[in-house]
Design a protein with these regions (language model features):
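Catalytic Zn2+-binding segment of zinc metalloproteases
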Residues: 146-165, 229-232
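C-terminal capping/extension segments of zinc metalloprotease domains
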Residues: 225-240, 248-329
Length: 329
């Protein structure tokens, strides 16, 4: 269940959010590790405590950060009773409590699920999503996001994302210890060990990216399970999201939003900055119906570059994702 590729970026899953927040955690932990090393109070246990604490704090306050960055506000039932009923019905089918419905004032069509014990669960839709998709397509996107909440993907990815950060900063701090505390009697042994830890953290992170992509497929399956003809609806919604994002980028309508979108674009269903690059073929297929567009994309042969880009992505390749949805139809 996951994705970024040369043709188009996919349903943004809650998991990409966690990946973005992990970057913030990592940078903060790095600063603390440097300080602790330089002042002479560094040890493995203290660094581990710092990493754990920062992960927990980041997770707890992340809804507030997301709300500020994306101008998210709660959408009252009076403003959009139909959307509230839709999410309520899908939540019942998903056998979860209805999350808070949020609206992000962004013209690019997208949606995301997030939350913490302090705020509860949220599903946010952008203004652009409501303006672009029809009712069935919005249902498919929301069903995908509810799948992330049902499967507790936020919590799972938060826990596993902590591990590579821990090993990386242990390795980095070992290198700092060798450089700044005069430990040269080991002939650079601690520095080599530190490099080994950093390489291991990178390898571990590749497995975590793979896990994230699997959970994207899992969320897609959930959307299909709670909707009639869900596979087709989710497929067409993805095609329309990419087409519209590309058009908005080309006309420059989202320029004022781009700095924020670029900073935390991993939170989204699809990468708004990659829409032009990821949809070269879409320019040729622009006038085709959404169903024809889906068929064109699923027939595309994946290149080595496509597969390589997917390996470093939190989401699956769009072609593979659409093919998986076809198998569920």
């Amino acid at each position: 269940m996951q994705p970024q590729i040369r043709n188009m970026n996919l349903l943004k899953l809650r998991l990409s959010m966690v990946g973005t927040l992990a970057t913030i955690i990592g940078l903060s932990t790095l600063v603390f590790a440097i300080i602790m090393s330089l002042v002479g109070v560094f040890d493995i246990l203290s660094l581990g405590v710092v990493v754990v604490v920062f992960n927990l704090i980041q997770w707890l306050i992340s809804p507030y950060l997301i709300g500020a960055i994306y101008r998210v506000r709660e959408l009252s039932e009076n403003e959009n009773p139909h959307l509230h009923r839709m999410i309520g019905n899908l939540s019942k089918k998903s056998k979860i409590s209805k999350p808070k419905l949020m609206l992000a004032q962004i013209s690019i069509p997208n949606a995301f699920a997030y939350g913490s014990p302090l705020t509860g669960s949220h599903v946010a839709v952008t203004k652009g999503l409501l303006d672009t998709l029809n009712e069935d397509e919005v249902k498919a996107v929301v069903g995908h996001e509810l799948g992330h909440l049902k499967h507790r993907d936020v919590q799972i990815m938060m826990v596993v994302s902590f591990l590579p950060a821990l090993f990386y900063y242990i390795g980095f701090s070992l290198m700092l210890s060798n450089m700044y505390r005069g430990r040269r009697d080991d002939n650079g042994g601690s520095a080599l060990i530190g490099i080994g830890f950093m390489v291991f953290s990178w390898i571990l992170n590749m497995f975590i990216l793979y896990l994230s992509r699997l959970r994207e497929y899992y969320a897609d399956r959930h959307a299909v399970s709670v909707l009639n003809n869900g596979a087709q609806k989710l497929s067409t919604s993805l095609a329309k999201i990419v087409k519209t994002t590309r058009r908005i980028n080309e006309t420059g309508k989202s320029k004022q939003q781009k700095p924020n979108l670029s900073a935390y674009k991993a939170l989204f269903i699809s990468d708004p900055d990659r829409a032009n690059e990821d949809s070269v073929e879409l320019a040729i297929m622009e006038n085709k119906s959404n169903q024809n567009l889906v068929r064109e994309l699923t027939s595309k042969k994946l290149t080595f570059a496509d597969k390589l880009l997917e390996a470093f992505s939190t989401h699956p390749n769009i072609v593979k994702r659409l093919r998986a949805l076809q198998e569920l139809s």
